[in-house]
Amino acid sequence: MPRKGAVAKREVLPDPIYNSKLVTRLINRLMLDGKRGTASKILYQAFDIIKEQTGNEPLDVFEEAMKNIMPVLEVKARRVGGSNYQVPIEVRPDRRTTLGLRWLVQYSRLRGEHTMSERLAKEIMDAANNTGAAVKKREDTHKMADANRAFAHYRW
């Protein structure tokens, strides 16, 4: 526990093109070694691919994808009387978004398409259609929470 109290949350500035804080957070999540320009280029190219292939507004597709990826429940290990229980808990809204973005980028990187922008675009489109690895991760998380519902009374 920190002695000086909780660290204040930094306000994220919306990105200049789509004017969305969620897009900025995705750029930050994509960024490697502080190369924000490269991360921005990858994301905007992915959005161009989405617009080209779906004909819809890329930001709407992305927000729909995020809605389908963000988990509502997760399990947390609690030690009670010498044994560990996986206790299902509700996910806070800020953590929901963070997990959604993390899974989106993680499973985009594992895909087989040629460029990262293609991988990201395909994963976003899959997530918007309720398919893809990131949505599967959310479903697995929910299944795990559902399977451990018996331990829900250990929540505190």
Curated annotation (Swiss-Prot):
InterPro entries with a match to the protein in the record: Ribosomal_uS7, Ribosomal_uS7_bac/org-type, Ribosomal_uS7_CS, Ribosomal_uS7_dom, Ribosomal_uS7_dom_sf
Repeat listed as a keyword: no
UniProt key word Kinase: no
Gene Ontology CC: small ribosomal subunit
Keywords: Ribonucleoprotein, Ribosomal protein, RNA-binding, rRNA-binding, tRNA-binding
Source species, domain of life: Bacteria
One function term, GO molecular function aspect: structural constituent of ribosome
Biological processes annotated in GO: translation
Protein family membership: Belongs to the universal ribosomal protein uS7 family.
Role: One of the primary rRNA binding proteins, it binds directly to 16S rRNA where it nucleates assembly of the head domain of the 30S subunit. Is located at the subunit interface close to the decoding center, probably blocks exit of the E-site tRNA.
Quaternary state and interactors: Part of the 30S ribosomal subunit. Contacts proteins S9 and S11.
Protein name: Small ribosomal subunit protein uS7
Source organism of the structure: Ligilactobacillus salivarius (strain UCC118)
Gene name of the record: rpsG
